[in-house]
Design a protein with these regions (language model features):
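Domain-level signature for soluble enzymes in the chorismate/prephenate branch of the shikimate pathway
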Residues: 1-203
Length: 203
């Protein structure tokens, strides 16, 4: 079973991308609070594979992740491009008129700016992760709180989906890189032998 370190919790877009990339394989996710911890997981255990967002069609290049990658000594073994579709979700027994606050990752909030502008009554609060925002609302039964996250996260944490596809730009894609310890690269690449070779340059 492959161990995959991701930023975020179960139901996050990193979770979705990891399961799509390793479809048909058994994987165990290591959920990390931040991207630094993804690389720390690889340093602690060379068998761990990392998956991290590197570029978004709306937000652009994630410069911090490029720098972490450059410093890490890991090698890129693959990539996955995921269509990002955000949902507006709340507790199962609540509706639009009950909501006063919306929580999500800053980039997700930015990608849904037009939707949020249509609902000025909602206080916008940044969180560490899209799926984690939904998880906290459900676990702590936070009345009046909504989250912006994936539909998969809503289903995982038992949240009600009030509206799907709330992102401003429907051509919203994130490119994820799959990285590994250099000593594991050859073996891992054999499992994806049909992948197209690419080069990434950080200036």
């Amino acid at each position: 079973m492959k161990k995959i370190a991701i930023q975020g919790t179960l139901g996050s877009y990193h979770d979705i991308a990891a399961h799509k990339y390793f479809e048909g394989e058994e994987i165990e996710l290591i959920c990390c609070a931040n991207f630094e911890d993804v690389f720390t997981s690889i340093r602690k255990d060379s068998q761990v594979i990392g998956m991290l967002a590197i570029e978004n069609t709306i937000a652009g290049s994630l410069l911090h992740n490029n720098e972490l990658l450059r410093q890490s000594g890991t090698q890129i073994i693959g990539e996955y491009k995921l269509r990002i579709s955000h949902s507006f979700v709340c507790l199962p027994d609540e509706n639009w008129e009950d909501l006063t606050e919306v929580n999500s990752h800053p980039i997700a909030l930015m990608q849904c700016r037009e939707f949020l502008n249509q609902h000025p009554q909602l206080k916008v609060v940044e969180g560490e992760d899209t799926a984690r925002s939904a998880e906290i609302i459900k676990n702590e039964n936070l009345k009046g709180h909504a989250a912006i996250c994936s539909k998969a996260a809503a289903e995982r944490y038992g949240m009600k989906v009030l509206q799907e596809g709330i992102e401003t730009n429907k051509h919203n894609f994130t490119r994820f890189l799959v990285v590994a310890d250099p000593w594991q690269v050859d073996e891992l690449r054999q499992h994806h032998a049909n992948a197209t070779n690419k080069a990434s340059i950080v200036l």
